[in-house]
Amino acid sequence: MIDLSKMKERSVDMNNEVFEAFNNGCFEVPEVEKSFKDVPWSKHPTFEGVELKHILTSKETGGAYSFHLVRIAPGKSILDHIHDPQLETHEVIAGKGTCINDGHEIAYLPGVISVMPPQVHHEVHAGEEGLFLFAKFLPALC
């Protein structure tokens, strides 16, 4: 008989490994080279249990775009909000959860990409494993 608890442990371990690969990754373009491990995590100013790693900011991109790693603790949420004038994208790296994007519920699983145009209400809820996202904003959020 298959031991489902061991399969779940392996799934969580693999998710953590994938996230750590991003967490310790790098960004390279001709004008910018940055190691993600050198960027500190900061607490989200509004949502408890949410941390951000600002990979590229407005300062580095002339305001054109910004990239962020987002870590949402198990059972925590980024509640309903909008961005104006930013378009936001989420790439789910690891963990599980849900996103309510313009009233539509999306299962957030590794490999899912979601796009929130400017002024569209959205929220994100982490499951029991937590949730790890790569978020991008056009123009830059910060």
Residue ranges and their predicted role:
Residues 70-73, 82-99:
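Short, conserved beta-strand element in jelly-roll/cupin
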Residues 79-81, 99-100, 116, 121-128:
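Short beta-strand His + acidic residue motifs that chelate non-heme Fe in jelly-roll/DSBH
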Residues 53-56, 66-83, 118:
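Conserved short histidine dyad/triad with adjacent acidic residue
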